[in-house]
């Protein structure tokens, strides 16, 4: 039998806090920043970046990008839930924000743990490289080689040399889409260039 908390001091947490969706203390601090938020969220297979502003009637999304767009619109053949895809999602969101005249934001990672080099910070790095001004510490950003997927390419080369069958099994989705995983860094640059072209870049 579960004992229920009782007494005058007991306070029921807000529903979204109980559901693990909102940290209201962090949300209040973000409101004080008086700037839109770069909301970075990740799932097992995808990354989502949004520029969101507070409003009395509820949050307003000013610009957004979803990693599935990388595949459907820009020909991304890698996994949509990895670090390179997270960076490109943040980059795309940042360019869309700038196109709408939004230059400054604060990072909002929600209830995700602030792990250095994680996908939420790869999205931050993408938005920064797009040209946005977002306060941050350099130490949380993933290194360039990880953003480009060098770690995935190196792992693929090693497995291919040691166990070709395991290589075929582990990277089957890459191969089905016509991409050798060891060529992911070059593919990353190709997709990034396509995104830049969408916004008039070279």
From Swiss-Prot:
UniProt keywords, alphabetically: Ribonucleoprotein, Ribosomal protein, RNA-binding, rRNA-binding
Span of the signal peptide: none
Function: This is one of the proteins that bind and probably mediate the attachment of the 5S RNA into the large ribosomal subunit, where it forms part of the central protuberance.
Assembly behavior: Part of the 50S ribosomal subunit. Contacts the 5S and 23S rRNAs.
Alphabetical list of HAMAP family matching this protein: Ribosomal_uL18_A
Similarity-based family: Belongs to the universal ribosomal protein uL18 family.
Protein known as: Large ribosomal subunit protein uL18
Organism: Methanopyrus kandleri (strain AV19 / DSM 6324 / JCM 9639 / NBRC 100938)
Gene that produces this protein: rpl18
């Amino acid at each position: 039998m579960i004992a229920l908390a009782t007494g005058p001091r007991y306070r029921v947490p807000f529903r979204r806090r109980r559901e693990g969706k909102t940290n209201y203390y962090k949300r209040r601090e973000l409101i004080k920043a008086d700037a839109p938020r770069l909301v970075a969220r990740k799932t097992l297979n995808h990354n989502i970046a949004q520029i969101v502003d507070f409003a009395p009637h509820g949050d307003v999304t000013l610009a957004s990008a979803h990693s599935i767009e990388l595949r459907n619109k820009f020909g991304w053949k890698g996994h949509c839930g990895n670090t390179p895809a997270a960076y490109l999602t943040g980059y795309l969101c940042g360019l869309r924000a700038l196109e709408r005249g939004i230059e400054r934001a604060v990072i909002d990672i929600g209830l995700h743990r602030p792990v250095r080099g994680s996908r939420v910070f790869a999205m931050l790095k993408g938005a920064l490289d797009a040209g946005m001004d977002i306060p941050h510490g350099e130490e949380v950003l993933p290194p360039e080689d990880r953003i480009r997927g060098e770690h995935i390419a190196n792992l693929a080369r090693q497995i291919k040399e040691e166990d070709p069958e395991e290589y075929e099994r582990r990277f089957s989705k890459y191969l089905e889409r016509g991409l050798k995983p060891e060529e992911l860094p070059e593919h990353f640059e190709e997709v990034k260039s396509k995104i830049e072209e969408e916004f008039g870049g070279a």
